Amino acid sequence: MDSMKKKIAYLLLLLMLIPVGSFAKEKRTFEIKDGHFYVNGKVTPILSGEMHYPRIPHQYWRHRLRMMRAMGLNTVATYVFWNLHETEPGKWDFEGDKNLAEYIRIAGEEGLMVILRPGPYVCAEWEFGGYPWWLQNIPGMEIRRDNPEFLKRTKLYIDKLYEQVGDLQVSKGGPIIMVQAENEFGSYVAQRKDIPLEEHRRYNAKIKRQLADAGFNVPLFTSDGSWLFEGGSTPGALPTANGESNVENLKKVVNEYHGGVGPYMVAEFYPGWLMHWAEPFPDISDSGIARQTETYLQNDVSFNFYMVHG
């Protein structure tokens, strides 16, 4: 075994030795307090991997989730794809590979906590960022802004989502520990400077309010590039940074937008990268990922591998 393989094996062992409690089939508590994540009253880092339920045949969900647990992770994160479920106005589908609730239940049975990322915009290299195509046919519709027609539809979506998975929150004995409000909204704010910042912030706050009004009562969070928190963060939600490798910068910017304290999390830590036509294959080294993982672990930084599978 060469030195790099030894280092990766060591990191996997270290991940598995971090105390995460006996999660499987056990009711747990989760809270953000004193700058840390607490599981069952103990400071616990979130060691997460992203895996999207519709990108894996449902017959393989349990096997893949079990593999995630075996590699030392304690959490799985997933987007929720609005256009996957509401294929036509008012026509909902949560069967088969779309059975989000079953996916979450299996994750809990396999000892994993769950981070839910419902958008309503999700990016994820998914058609229309997860928005249903038919939104474009509604008169007066302006997506992703403080628009009555749009917010009416996002409310229906979020309420329907709560019907499916609300009882699976950790507050009700389930595995869902956190829910993301919007998604990388700071990037959109940076691109849409024609819209006043205050309007962007109103919209962002209203999505957060819709989640709370529907019944989601676990901690909410946002995820953005660390230089985009001004537009992407929203009061009452933990700001997390995507792709941030500089721990000092991560802690500085989170402190600025979160009352001077953590916890600190990289909600998208990239062990791979997407490929575009006619571009060179992304060159990401195993050794670099191993070193960065070690840095996070040594500095009380939680993370979510984007992606682990799927």
Over which residues does each language-model region extend?
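Catalytic-core region of carbohydrate-active enzymes that cleave or remodel glycosidic bonds
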Residues: 245-310
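Conserved, mostly hydrophobic/aromatic
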Residues: 41, 68, 76, 107, ...
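Aromatic-lined substrate-binding rim segments of carbohydrate-active enzymes
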Residues: 61-127, 208-213
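N-terminal carbohydrate-binding accessory modules
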Residues: 23-75, 105
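Bacterial N-terminal signal peptides
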Residues: 11-19
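Active-site neighborhood of glycoside hydrolase catalytic domains
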Residues: 153-231
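Aromatic- and acidic-residue-enriched segments that line the glycan-binding/catalytic groove
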Residues: 90-96, 120-144, 190-200, 236-243
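An active-site-proximal structural segment forming one wall of the substrate-binding cleft
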Residues: 99-116, 139-176
